[in-house]
C-alpha cells in the first residue's frame, strides 16, 4: 500500500469526524431543547 499524500487523508478523516460530531450534537440537542422548552 503506497500512501502518496497522508496529509490529504488526515484532512478527509478530520472533516468526516467533524461532520459526524456536528450531527451527533444536533441529534442530542433536539430532545434536550424539547425537554427544556416544555
UniProtKB/Swiss-Prot annotation:
It comes from the Eukaryota. The lineage of its organism: Eukaryota, Viridiplantae, Streptophyta, Embryophyta, Tracheophyta. It is a single-pass membrane protein. PSII is composed of 1 copy each of membrane proteins PsbA, PsbB, PsbC, PsbD, PsbE, PsbF, PsbH, PsbI, PsbJ, PsbK, PsbL, PsbM, PsbT, PsbX, PsbY, PsbZ, Psb30/Ycf12, at least 3 peripheral proteins of the oxygen-evolving complex and a large number of cofactors. It forms dimeric complexes. Belongs to the PsbL family. Pfam families: PsbL. One of its GO terms (biological process) is photosynthesis. Keywords: Chloroplast, Membrane, Photosynthesis, Photosystem II, Plastid, Reaction center, Thylakoid, Transmembrane, Transmembrane helix. The keyword Chloroplast applies. It is found in: Plastid, Chloroplast thylakoid membrane. SUPFAM superfamilies: Photosystem II reaction center protein L, PsbL (SSF161017). The keyword Thylakoid applies. This is Photosystem II reaction center protein L. One of the components of the core complex of photosystem II (PSII). PSII is a light-driven water:plastoquinone oxidoreductase that uses light energy to abstract electrons from H(2)O, generating O(2) and a proton gradient subsequently used for ATP formation. It consists of a core antenna complex that captures photons, and an electron transfer chain that converts photonic excitation into a charge separation. This subunit is found at the monomer-monomer interface and is required for correct PSII assembly and/or dimerization. The chain crosses the membrane at residues 17-37. One of its GO terms (cellular component) is chloroplast thylakoid membrane.
